[in-house]
Amino acid sequence: MRELAIEIGVRALLFGVFVFTEFLDPFQRVIQPEEIWLYKNPLVQSDNIPTRLMFAISFLTPLAVICVVKIIRRTDKTEIKEAFLAVSLALALNGVCTNTIKLIVGRPRPDFFYRCFPDGVMNSEMHCTGDPDLVSEGRKSFPSIHSSFAFSGLGFTTFYLAGKLHCFTESGRGKSWRLCAAILPLYCAMMIALSRMCDYKHHWQDSFVGGVIGLIFAYICYRQHYPPLANTACHKPYVSLRVPASLKKEERPTADSAPSLPLEGITEGPV
């Protein structure tokens, strides 16, 4: 229980840091007049995939898949716990890392011009006249948090399904339905990332790098708890594969159980 409490505490701390960084102001990067066209896209009020929906998909999808697998395969509580710990760590680390980069880089969004100058008229000093909160949020383009969270949560779901379905082991290779089922979450993550460019909220580099960050954390945290996908036991967490210390002691040969040497043909020598 103590180890579990520590694990939960680490994740709570990371999510706390993530929420804290959400309210910090980013670096105010100087925008040169010749590059203003990059940030002059229209300001879209209604997103294709709102932030709340993105968080719901990224957080609830892996949890729902884990619960469905438990019902179908009747997995034990230990396996469910390990899966929850792995995906929660991936999401927490991803959030902290993505927001940290956002604040340090301070890249303007594609619609930054109309956040800064709502009337479409730029003054000579280039001092923003728009809502300060909207302007500050407009300097958090790189990388895309929609993309990073989508690829973190749904990317983990892909690795989890690939392990459960043995997509890359001898028994599972060549069965296309297994591979399609495993990569479906990644397809959904890609659609979420691309939607941010359609909303003029991110440049393509923002979505691409965000996806890479999310996928890296998804794989790292998955491998912390599960064997490689090519392993024959990839459907089980490491905890379930470890041999308990009590069993190890029972397997050790004792003096009574040690094999005896044959005595035939052995005679006593002279004293």
Swiss-Prot record:
Phenotype upon changing residue 202 to A: Loss of phosphatase activity
Gene, per the UniProt record: PLPP4
Cell compartment(s), UniProt: Membrane
Keywords of this entry: Hydrolase, Lipid metabolism, Membrane, Transmembrane, Transmembrane helix
Chain residue ranges for the region called Phosphatase sequence motif III: 195-205
Region (Phosphatase sequence motif I): 102-110
Chain intervals for the UniProt region annotation (Disordered): 250-271
Similarity section: Belongs to the PA-phosphatase related phosphoesterase family.
Native source organism of the sequence: Homo sapiens
Known tissue expression: Expressed mainly to the brain, kidney and testis, and to a lesser extent the bone marrow, thymus, prostate, liver and uterus.
Taxonomy of the source species: Eukaryota, Metazoa, Chordata, Craniata, Vertebrata
Any one Pfam family match given in the protein's UniProt record, by short name: PAP2
Pathway per the UniProt entry: Lipid metabolism; phospholipid metabolism
GO terms of biological process kind: blastocyst hatching; Fc-gamma receptor signaling pathway involved in phagocytosis; phospholipid dephosphorylation; phospholipid metabolic process; regulation of calcium ion import
Resulting phenotype, residue 146 to A: Loss of phosphatase activity
Protein name stated in the entry: Phospholipid phosphatase 4
PANTHER family, per database record: LIPID PHOSPHATE PHOSPHATASE, PHOSPHOLIPID PHOSPHATASE 4
Membrane topology of this protein: Multi-pass membrane protein
Keyword check for Hydrolase: yes
